[in-house]
Design a protein with these regions (language model features):
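Polar, surface-exposed loop/tail segments
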Residues: 27-30, 68, 72-131, 178-182, ...
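Histidine-centered active-site microenvironments of extracellular/periplasmic hydrolases
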Residues: 19-70, 80, 129
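Conserved beta-strand positions that form and line the central face of beta-propeller blades
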Residues: 41, 53, 62, 74, ...
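A long, amphipathic alpha-helix that forms part
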Residues: 1-30
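Conserved hydrophobic "DFG−1" position in protein kinase catalytic cores
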Residues: 44, 64, 107, 132-133, ...
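Long, internal low-complexity/basic segments
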Residues: 3-6, 10, 80, 84, ...
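C-terminal, low-complexity/hydrophilic appendages and adjacent surface loops
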Residues: 55-57, 122-171, 176-179, 198
């Protein structure tokens, strides 16, 4: 009940912001972005918080409203929170600085068919790393030497056939596990992750 109460409260507050934009006359020249940095397990997988790499915690909403944004399109594609900045620059007609490594979501918004990321990655402290290609997700767990928490294991999920991530295929789908582990290793090397050789 508390969780649904939070949703209702948030919905009301977002409504107040949108109404204030309407009253101010600025609604038509304001970009509104609704997103989150994480979800909550709320009991799924026996977890309550956000400290995991399952879809209920890492797959977050992203709704954009404003001039130049198609109002009738929903897109199911891999993206990163970092992609919001160059997207807003494009929509506002501002040049994206060369130092920005993320990608604009505008091609996805316009066609709904573009692919910006073949894979996305995430991490939690020194105990979890994740790579996902949209269908297959590999989660690698580590034992933290500092806090002496965590465990060493790998999970692999086929999100197309198991969206709730209940059937670990890491020992039955070795080809996908090896492919994704290689991609994860390359990403960890690129970002200088100290757990690469752990």
């Amino acid at each position: 009940a508390d969780y649904y109460g939070m949703i209702e409260h948030m919905d009301a507050k977002i409504g107040q912001v949108l109404e204030a934009l309407n009253v101010s006359g600025r609604a038509d020249d304001t970009m509104v972005v609704y997103t989150a940095d994480h979800g909550l397990a709320v009991g799924q997988h026996g977890l309550m918080g956000k400290q995991n790499m399952y879809e209920h915690s890492v797959s977050v909403p992203l709704v954009v409203r404003g001039e130049g944004v198609p109002c009738d399109r929903a897109v199911d594609a891999l993206s990163l929170t970092y992609d919001i900045y160059p997207t807003l620059c494009n929509l506002a007609g501002i040049e994206v600085p060369e130092s920005v490594e993320s990608r604009s979501l505008l091609p996805l918004m316009e066609s709904g068919e573009a692919v910006l990321h073949e894979t996305v990655y995430s991490h939690y402290k020194d105990i979890q790393r994740m790579v996902c290609d949209g269908r297959w997700k590999l989660i690698r767990y580590y034992r933290s030497e500092g806090s002496e928490t965590g465990t060493r294991r790998v999970q692999l999920f086929d999100l197309a056939n198991d969206p709730w991530e209940m059937d670990d295929l890491s020992e039955r789908e070795e080809g996908h596990a090896v492919r994704l582990q290689k991609a994860l290793d390359e990403w960890m090397r690129a970002v200088g992750d100290p757990l690469l050789d752990a």
